Every structure is written in structure tokens, then in C-alpha cells.
Amino acid sequence: MRNTDKRRDILDLKIGKSVKYTAAAFSGAFMHLTFLVIFAIIQLYIMVIFNVFSVGLYIVLGLICKRENFERRAYNWVSAIYFEIALHSFLCTLFLGVNTCFFLYTMMTIPVMLYYLFLTCEKKMFKRGTFLFSLCSLALLSAALTFDHFCDPFFYTFRRPLTLNETDLMRTINIAFN
């Protein structure tokens, strides 16, 4: 068998939905574990606590996906994940400012969450989710960017401005994860 034939065989693998959802959930847990470490290093403890919750949410979701129960309550899980991501993005933008690029997650949530809704929910739920998630994303993004325009980030107010290396590290991680 030639090398190109082997590659084609790998690309033709059929991967079940539960494996895809499980991989996405554990990827989310890994991302938040990374954020947890970064926030612990810069001593932003409110976000450390938030990320402990986030890691737990994604691990529970990953375990549920393994049992293939995800699609029965897909709208609830997608909504929980959406609001976790949107709130995390909003709080990080308030605490750390737009230079760290956490606001990108607010924009990223719309296509990603709507894709999951499209795959798992009825048309009525999809339309409701589209409207709700888009409106919430617009409101949170507008509020965070307006706050950042007129005020210093909370972390700067209570602690210190981030160093250029800290800002670059967070920006790099956020762009890579988005």
C-alpha cells in the first residue's frame, strides 16, 4: 500500500457524533485549564475561580457526551456553554482590557454555537437560539468594548497594568484558541 493510500484511509474514517462532542468538550476543559494557570500566575483570583467552574462544566459535558446523552438535552448544554463562554469573555475584557483579545470569544461563539444547534436541535429551537445568542453577544460585546473605551480595566485599577510579556502571552493564546 502506498503512502498516499494510507492517508486516504485515515481521512475516510467515520467518527461518531459522541466522539466529536466529547473531543470538543475536553478541548474546552483544556483551554480553561490553561486560562486557570495564567490567571493564577497573574493573581486574578476571581477568574481562577470562574475557570475552576468552567473546567468542571466541560469535564461533566465530556463525560455525558461519551454516554451519547448529549443530543437529548442539546439545547440546554449548548446554552450553558454559550453563556459560560460569553460571560468569561466579558469578564476577562472588563478585568484585563481588549489588548488581551478575550473579546474575540464573544464573536466566535455565534457561529460555533449555532453550528452545534443546527446539528442537534429542531428548527424552532435553532431560530430561538440564533436570536438569543446573537442578541446577547451583541450586548455583551458592546458593553465590554464601551467600558474599555471609557475606563481602565479593573485589574489595572486594583493591582497593576499587565506587562507587555503577559499581554502578548494572553493575546497569543487567545488568537490560537480562536
Which residues fall in each region the model found?
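Juxtamembrane helix-loop boundaries in multi-pass membrane proteins
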Residues: D12-A24
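Hydrophobic transmembrane alpha-helices and their membrane-interface boundaries in multi-pass
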Residues: A23-M113, S137
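Alpha-helical transmembrane segments and their interfaces in multipass membrane proteins
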Residues: L33-F53, E71, L96, L119-N178
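Membrane-interface helix-boundary motifs at transmembrane edges
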Residues: L11-I15, L63-W77, F118-T130
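Short, Lys/Arg-rich, polar N-terminal cytosolic tail immediately upstream
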Residues: M1-I15
